[in-house]
Design a protein with these regions (language model features):
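Conserved DHp (HisKA) dimerization/phosphotransfer helix of two-component histidine kinases, i.e.
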Residues: 1-47
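Conserved catalytic submotifs in the C-terminal HATPase_c
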Residues: 49, 54-64
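Glycine-rich phosphate-binding loop
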Residues: 130-140
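Glycine-rich ATP-binding loops of the HATPase_c
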Residues: 149-168
């Protein structure tokens, strides 16, 4: 019960921080981002199993602790992962932690990006119209990332893999969400 109360208080504080457009009421903690991501993947295991999907996690072997707001970080990546599980229609989601980026890639059908672009910052109004059911979640992710000093972009998987040949993923259809950390 105490953990539930603490979790609810953290959620309320995080939502207030979002509404106030400040992180002054939250405490940044030295954290291994890989631990947060691994916990999210574990939390979503039953959902992914029920959908016949697998979430793969690749950590950065040279990872250093970084100051993070745990609740906001969990909201950002939890939302992106849940969207991938709910809308990709694929069989796998890959989460790749690199030095200053996190890639979340699915092998689903993808979406038509506006104006035939292959990359789209998640702030565009037009993008929200293209992705039914995602709009509010992606707006929240974009706002959280902005408050954290991060940037988030959505890529066509094939385009991204053609332009980033250092990423070891199969050349399939799908989407890649990249969160650029500060």
């Amino acid at each position: 019960l105490n953990n539930t109360i603490e979790d609810m208080q953290l959620l309320v504080d995080t939502l207030l921080a979002i509404a106030r457009n400040t992180t002054n009421t939250l405490t940044a903690e030295p954290t291994m981002l890989s631990e947060c991501l691994e916990n999210l993947v574990q939390d979503l295991d039953s959902v992914s199993d029920n959908k016949g999907m697998r979430i793969n996690f690749q950590k950065d072997l040279d990872e250093q602790r970084r100051k993070l707001y745990p609740s906001m970080t969990k909201m950002v990546f939890g939302n992106i992962l849940r969207n991938a599980l709910n809308y990709s229609q694929g069989t796998e989601i890959d989460v790749i932690l690199q030095k200053n980026t996190v890639l979340i890639a699915d092998n689903g059908v993808g979406i038509p990006l506006p104006n035939n672009s292959k990359v789209q910052e998640l702030s565009g109004q037009q993008l929200q119209l293209e992705i039914k059911g995602h709009g509010i979640g992606l707006q929240l992710v974009q706002k959280l990332c902005k408050q954290l000093g991060w940037r988030v972009e959505l890529f066509d998987r094939q385009y991204y893999l053609n332009t980033h040949q250092d990423v070891d993923l199969a050349m399939t259809t799908g989407l890649i969400v990249v969160v650029y950390l500060k």
